[in-house]
Regions:
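Conformationally flexible catalytic loops at phosphate/diphosphate-handling active centers
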Residues: 2-53
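Gly-rich Lys/Arg/Thr-decorated short loops/hinges at beta-loop-alpha junctions or inter-strand turns
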Residues: 22-32, 94-98, 194-205, 250-252
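Active-site diphosphate/adenylate-binding microenvironment
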Residues: 196-268
Length: 276
């Protein structure tokens, strides 16, 4: 139902001590939650028309793109349109971080160029993100010049934190696949030049003091471990890994998102790929 992922069910101790039996239904029927996750073609075409007319369009890819395994078709859409991409932390890897149209992560743990692109874009085309406070900052200052398209499988996420101009409730992969059928190239050369200027003005880096530091470790990972699954725990190293480790078609990253569950990393090493 809606956004997939873990759910916390908190039961009193005396209930947990009782015995019982349960059967999980094949079809879950929740009276108050019945989203239609099939792509509304009319809404999608409106969004794509808006995209084609934008002078400073920007894709925002969230974790929903990765959960839906939509990376390949998303890259196809990005390359067809020539629209640059920023990602959330959980969206990292939606497109290779080495791709020329990838700018960086946005938000409080993001890159200068990515945050400037969000601030100056005139269309923010968002897919699979819930607009949490780590990426938005002050809500009334977020993407102040932009019309916003929001594609998300969870109807409860639409316009919850950020008002959107075109809402589309849909599975990310289904929506992006339909986009690939209809999108046309956008005129973004001047916009891309401005983004490159921001990248050169404030590149993502950290201070070096002559001894081995985090950047040396991340550079070694990028150089030596091409086919790897990167798993982080929670804390500053998680944010730095999300910023500095390149995530490509061969190298994946797994980390905890909103709940910040410390101890997550060790268990994920065991269950993500137990044969490796």
């Amino acid at each position: 139902t809606g956004k997939p992922g873990p759910v916390l069910i908190d039961l009193p101790k005396d209930v947990m001590a009782e015995f019982g039996s349960a059967e999980y239904p094949k079809n879950v029927n929740i009276r108050g939650y019945k989203p239609n996750t099939s792509v509304h073609i009319g809404q999608l075409k409106r969004a794509l028309k808006m995209l084609s007319k934008a002078k400073r369009p920007l894709f925002l890819a969230g974790g929903g793109v990765n959960i839906a395994h939509a990376q390949e078709v998303f890259r196809e859409v990005v390359e067809k349109t020539q629209v640059p991409v920023v990602t959330t932390g959980m969206g990292r890897g939606a497109i290779s971080t080495k791709h020329p149209l990838f700018i960086g992560n946005l938000g409080m743990h993001g890159a200068y160029a990515a945050n400037m692109a969000v601030s100056e874009c005139d269309l923010l085309f968002s897919i699979g993100t819930r607009f949490n406070d780590r990426i938005t900052g002050k809500l009334h200052e977020f993407a102040p010049h932009a019309q916003i398209v929001h594609i998300d499988i969870d109807t409860a996420s639409i316009s919850r934190n950020i008002h959107v101009d075109i809402p589309i409730v849909a599975d990310a992969k289904e929506a992006i696949t339909k986009m690939a059928e209809y999108v046309e190239p956008c005129s973004t050369s001047k916009w891309l030049a401005q983004i490159d200027a921001w990248k050169n003005e404030h590149p993502l880096t950290m201070r070096q003091n002559g001894v081995m530091g985090p950047l040396d470790i991340f550079n070694a990972i990028n150089e030596k471990f091409d086919d790897a699954i990167i798993v982080t725990d929670v804390g500053q190293h998680q944010m730095l890994t999300s910023q500095y480790v390149d995530i490509t078609e061969n190298r994946q990253i797994i980390m905890s998102g909103g709940l910040g569950t410390m101890g997550y990393g060790l268990s994920l090493i065991h269950i993500s790929e137990p044969t490796r």
